[in-house]
Amino acid sequence: MIVTDAWFPQTNGVVTTLAQTAAWLGRFGYEVRVVSPREFRTFPCPTYPEIRVAVFPYREMARRIAAFNPHALHIATEGVLGCAARRYCLSEGLRFTTSYHTQFPQYLRSRAPIPLWASYRALRWFHGAGERCFVSTSTVTRELAARGFRHLVRWQRGVDTEVFQPGPKEFLDLPRPIAAYVGRIAVEKNVGTFLAMPWAGSKLVIGDGPARAELEAQHPAARFVGFRFGSDLASHLAAADVMVFPSLTDTFGLVNLEAMACGVPVAAFPVAGPIDVIDDGVTGVLDVDLARAARRALDLNPADCRARALRSGWDVSTREFEAQLASCQRHEVSWRVRPHPAVSATG
């Protein structure tokens, strides 16, 4: 069972990761139940209406966990549903694992004057009760360990290289070179830095979010196309000459792998997430000057980008997830990890 506050129709790396993991676990022979806000009464998050927040979910959460009786329970998010599942597990003496997907302390600080130490204390409390906390990169693992987090293990991310693959540059009729941004358009994503950087060609923004209207008005020369999905997203991405990843707060950045799978190099700041994903000078460029990184990335070999992505399929990511659950079993965790005879992913 996977419990998550982030699920469809949200569009973000957490949802993609969990959906792909659930699907691949099903292919490996497990019955998977995803418990998401879809199954509860919800209200829209005041600052981000696309996010639905469950209302008083504890009783229904307890009922669903008890009815499914999972051999392994993974709490993927620290939201209302994650807290309800955590509370039930602790009350019933059930072991569980968690994962650290989002740098909430930095996100919160970008929106309100909340000190980092307070946010990290809350996250230590949440994850500290789990048997393992799954983290996507070595850099974030070290940062969390330095802040007192325990039982941290690696769970890398993946990319669908059948959907994301090189395509015709002619798909986009824009002046070259084309620098693309892909993702939510929100203050914590630092999209304004990308839009403000000097660039001789075109800027393409693929995505949507609460900051879109303001940024689109401020940067009329940029092309905003909204969210794109599947092969349509891949076609837009493959037609770009470089993808720019301006975020300073992501734990990984799935779009980096998606760009590489399309043969498109990435320009990013040298911070946690990109440091672990981008091979500087081979699949992208890391630089404190984002425009300089983007210009240098234009000279990189698309074949090297594609080769990096081919080593990071979702099957590999899910096998690592499975192995971490199995390692808990070897350390005498009370629940067991074993395949069910049927495959069912709901939520």
Where are these regions (language model features)?
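Short alpha-helical donor nucleotide-sugar binding micro-motif in glycosyltransferases
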Residues: 127, 235-240, 321
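Conserved donor-binding/catalytic core segment of Leloir-type glycosyltransferases
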Residues: 168-206
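Nucleotide-sugar donor phosphate/pyrophosphate-binding loop at the beta->alpha transition
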Residues: 95-97, 106-125
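Aromatic "clamp/platform" in nucleotide-sugar-dependent glycosyltransferases that forms part
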Residues: 248
